[in-house]
Amino acid sequence: HHHFDHVGGLRTYLSQGTTIVTHDSNKEYYLDILFHPGPRTLNPDRLAKYNPMYWISRRPAPIETVSGEARGTGKYVITDGVKILEIYHVQDMNYELGDQSLRYGHHSEDMLMAYLPQDGILFNADLYTPTQSSALPKVTISMVTLNENIKKLKLSPVTHAPSHGQPGSHAQFLSIFGD
């Protein structure tokens, strides 16, 4: 997810050799923010300090992409031989299936979600944040999008781990829809 509150520290991770995984529509944007010559909050940051010639070295940035077009699903798998992490493109499903009223400002058009199938943990950015109160939140288009993606991909989450807030159960998520 390319919003500012999710990409902080990318240059630090890149300087340490981390591969960045994103939706393929984000790749050029990430290259721009990683190598833009403008001032940085941390100056010098780790990339400038330890790899100052990275960009002109002609080494390709270690950015791998997940694609996903309308009515198709991109998937990227990372494993250490024991655990499996599946990364999926989040489709703006209701919009892509023809309901123009459900367009949510491109919020999930280039978004990914991660799933640990062995643990039943689903990580999403900004689509759903479990509440810590007993009051159920109102259903949002983002929640509908997440729920439709879970169904289409046949995922079986037990726990939702949001990018903001505390984890919550999938049962709590389903109760929002009256399921």
Q: Which residue stretches match the model-derived regions?
A:
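Metallo-beta-lactamase
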Residues: 1-5, 16, 25-175
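Short active-site oxyanion
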Residues: 14-20, 157-158
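General beta-strand structural signal in soluble alpha/beta enzymes
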Residues: 22-23, 162
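Short, solvent-exposed mixed-charge patches
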Residues: 178-179
